[in-house]
């Protein structure tokens, strides 16, 4: 199967991200307006950032692709999205109470450097809300999707398991809480049908990911909190 370039596949995350489930996660995890400045990493076309700002959040974003930023402004007006190279965040220490990212963590080659920067810009006791695919379930899907055991690694270079997420975040001073968010939405069924066909939909009825144990969920919804200094 012909594969789109890695940068193209990453840019499509805004269209193919599980938007409905991401919103539910933020609500259930207790992210409320008035909690202080919020940074979205990987704003894409600005859909989530626009919603957060309309709901009263003091939110801004960063994005690696200038064309995506231009598209966000065409769709939603002059959103406060800065272009960054992805390695560093152009903000002062302790600038944000909250950081969020969706379908971004798995694309970052050096997740330790990423978490170091997130920790730096978060205020003491701040929170990082993120959604990222499960390493074990995603590898199976992507192998079938691309008909290759290695092609997906170019794009999803930093997939993590449940245990690996807990360990990596703990190394940077985070306490992690995983949320059980249903993912079998209309978008999810569309994706299964597109890439796996009717057999995939039939398999979905037998093995519904929403019924899997937390460590085997197709996507991890993580609330990572920095400990407050004593």
Which functions belong to the PLM regions below?
Residues 3-21, 47, 109-117, 127-225:
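S-adenosyl-L-methionine-dependent methyltransferase catalytic module, highlighting the catalytic core
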Residues 103-107:
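A short His-aromatic
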Residues 227-230:
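Generic C-terminal helix-cap and adjacent flexible tail
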Residues 56, 65, 74, 95-97, ...:
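Surface-exposed beta-strand edges and their flanking turn/coil or helix-capping segments
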Residues 1-92, 98-102, 115, 215-220:
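Conserved N-terminal segment of class I S-adenosyl-L-methionine
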